[in-house]
Amino acid sequence: MKLAVISDLHGNYYALSAVMEFLRRQQIDGIIGLGDFVTDGPFPQRMMGVLREMQEEFPCYLVRGNREEYLLENLWQPQNWKAGSSTSGLLDYTFRNLTEQDRKFFEQLPTDGVLIGKLDEAGKLVPVFVPQEEVTPDTCRESLFPALRLCHGAPGEIRGNFGLHPELLLSHLENLDASILLGGHSHKQEQKEYAGKTYLNPGSLGLALDDVGGHAHFAILTLENSTWQIECFQIPYDLEGYLAEFDRAELETHGSVLARSLKRTLTCGINYFYLTVKRVRELADALALTDLDEELWEKAERELK
């Protein structure tokens, strides 16, 4: 059995298309998706189209990321996002370009859970996803392959960040009922062993932080002799073609400074997206400002040149 693991696509349908072409040649049996499928990139409907194609072609086991959470929070209670704002313009652009069908799809995504092995009616071993609220002490023990725990940031915390809080990862591994913890969110490919358990972050498919740029990161789990073998991949995609889509969509008119920071991150694999946000908050705190106006964003952008 072969299962691909992807995370943090951030609307990059060029990267997803390249990865799907690669996975077809690998003859995989399914795809695990760890969230952040959309937001920030151009033409959200193109991304949704490739996602639907992926789900039609492969069995998929998907959980929600923090970007989907943001969109749903805006659906349930409007967040005062503004077009053209560096603070919220990219989120607003994505939200306005989603259909009711898309929003319902994100609503039905579980936040986390476990993937276990069972026999189907034909006696074939197949993966079965169990949402976390339905997991019992016996769920992982009864799995016919080493169980996989799926989350975006951390179990029970979509926005949990193991990169900022490594002690949180060790605590979760120590208490893990599954064999492998699969998580994303940091955009950095990583594998760690602790307390007899494994943590795997497949990296970001659409916005990888690798100091290189232009590569989609993901992983493949292969079941051999009742053990998961892990292989991590970094494959190139048509970055120039994707960046040209930013111009066609006039994305800078929607997201201003943050749209430019996103393009820069894609190009070099350094997180200027986060660095810009961080610097804006520092400037705002120093000036005791609560409104992150465009002058602060432009100042932060100049400082990071």
Predicted regions located by residue number:
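Active-site-proximal beta-strand elements of phosphoester/diester hydrolases
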Residues: 2-10, 146-155, 199-203
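Core catalytic region of metal-dependent phosphoesterases/phosphodiesterases
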Residues: 4-6, 11-97
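Active-site environment of divalent metal-dependent phosphoester hydrolases
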Residues: 10-15, 39-42, 67-72, 114-115, ...
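Glycine-rich phosphate-binding loop signature in dinucleotide/nucleotide-binding domains
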Residues: 23-27, 144, 175-177, 220
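Active-site neighborhood of divalent metal-dependent phosphoester bond hydrolases
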Residues: 54-137, 145, 163-172, 177
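Conserved hydrophobic/aromatic beta-strand scaffold that supports enzyme active sites
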Residues: 112-114, 150, 191, 218-220
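Ligand/cofactor pocket segment of small-molecule handling proteins
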Residues: 153-200
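Acidic, His/Gly-rich catalytic cores of divalent-metal-dependent hydrolytic chemistry
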Residues: 194-202, 206-305
